[in-house]
């Protein structure tokens, strides 16, 4: 069944659902991190050349990065990676699992926040809320890889999120995003259901949107949530 047939009219059902930053920190403490992909994201791997366009020395942003292994992929290719993640556990595990030495220091601009930097200087991970991140003046980016980010943001915060993302984009950017489609009356989220109409509303004025691929992503754990279908859709957003 195609995704378009499954554009659910009940997207509103999730609009008041809220997870706090503490809720997300607790997921790392209690190891409820089934969202982490140890082998990396296969659609990103498949479309990596399209995303990078053969360019070198790019700045790549990972919103809500967790311990995504893809950050190492980009750094190994000579790019500079910046991520933001609320869980210090996730950040420390990234460096440990990738065998990278790092430094950490408090961020003067944001109370309680820290920045963790690989000794090579190619990876900087900010431990704070993405909504506080603009105060750190992290600059602009050539590429953004958004997997498990927009779909993890409380639906009521979509506009704030989109404003921050758009503010981080350089000229001639490529913004690659993976979103999920399922019946939101059967699962409260996260990950949240983000219909294409919502993407257009959030990003359509500034970005051209192209769907690169749609795959059936239903796993046993999703069936346990009560879902009978789940599609993942990969979008490439570029400058209008």
From Swiss-Prot:
Q: What is the gene name?
A: Tpmt
Q: Has UniProt tagged this entry with the keyword Acetylation?
A: yes
Q: Which domain of life is it from?
A: Eukaryota
Q: What does this chain do?
A: Catalyzes the S-methylation of thiopurine drugs such as 6-mercaptopurine (also called mercaptopurine, 6-MP or its brand name Purinethol) using S-adenosyl-L-methionine as the methyl donor. TPMT activity modulates the cytotoxic effects of thiopurine prodrugs. A natural substrate for this enzyme has yet to be identified.
Swiss-Prot/TrEMBL keywords: Acetylation, Cytoplasm, Methyltransferase, S-adenosyl-L-methionine, Transferase
Q: What class of enzyme is it?
A: transferase
Q: Does the entry feature the keyword Translocase, yes or no? A: no
Q: What are the binding positions for substrate in this chain?
A: 35
Instruction: Tell me, in one coarse class, where this protein mainly resides.
Output: cytoplasm
| Name of the molecule in the record | Thiopurine S-methyltransferase
Gene Ontology CC: one annotated term: cytoplasm
PANTHER family of this UniProt entry? Answer: THIOPURINE S-METHYLTRANSFERASE (PTHR10259:SF11)
Q: Tell me the Pfam families matching this sequence.
A: TPMT
Oligomer status and interactors: Monomer.
User: Biological process GO terms, please?
Assistant: methylation
Give the reaction(s) catalysed: S-adenosyl-L-methionine + a thiopurine = S-adenosyl-L-homocysteine + a thiopurine S-methylether; mercaptopurine + S-adenosyl-L-methionine = 6-methylthiopurine + S-adenosyl-L-homocysteine + H(+)
Q: Which GO terms describe its molecular function?
A: thiopurine S-methyltransferase activity
Q: Which residues bind S-adenosyl-L-methionine?
A: 24-35, 64, 85, 129-130, 147
Question: EC number(s)?
Answer: 2.1.1.67
Q: List, alphabetically, the HAMAP family matched.
A: Thiopur_methtran
Family listed: Belongs to the class I-like SAM-binding methyltransferase superfamily. TPMT family.
The entry's localization annotation reads: Cytoplasm
Q: Which residues carry this modification: N6-acetyllysine?
A: 53
Question: What SUPFAM superfamilies does the entry give?
Answer: S-adenosyl-L-methionine-dependent methyltransferases
